[in-house]
Amino acid sequence: PAAGPGPYKLLPRLYFRSLVPQLHLKLHPEIAVETTYFDRHGTVSGGRIDLRPSLSLPFIKRYARIIPKLSLRHTEYFLKDEGAFNDRESRTVPVASLDARLFAERRLSLFGSTMLQTLEPRAYYLYIPKDGQDDIPIFDTGRFGTTFQSLFYENRFAGSDRVGDSNQLT
């Protein structure tokens, strides 16, 4: 059987992430920007710019960490197409999350040995509204595998072409 067109060439891929110094009220602004041009013969090619500004207000103590966060995910596409997509597509999706952890420790004597017992419960709430993304090509996006850590990811997709809707408490 004939091989498919193969993977996209990235010409180039630039990524920038900035943690802005703390503002008053302990707000933590952050911005991530990625720009990539995807090229593959015989199919849709084009550029993508992904902007992810966010603002969080961490509450961090020795016994707890609570981080509410608001983000905006804006992705813009500039396409050279074989007919399936418009020349220009975009998507803007708000993201809200609340990550809460408690840290409890106690000394424990067991069989003559002193140990430190630690309990770290965590609750994570994520809200992302449903957004139709059928008009956007998939250049480099796939689903993450299911792991314990993936329960706390902001997006169930790896890559910038899809943002998974969510209204869940983990």
Each language-model region and where it sits:
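Outer-membrane beta-barrel proteins and related beta-barrel translocases across Gram-negative bacteria
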Residues: P1-T170
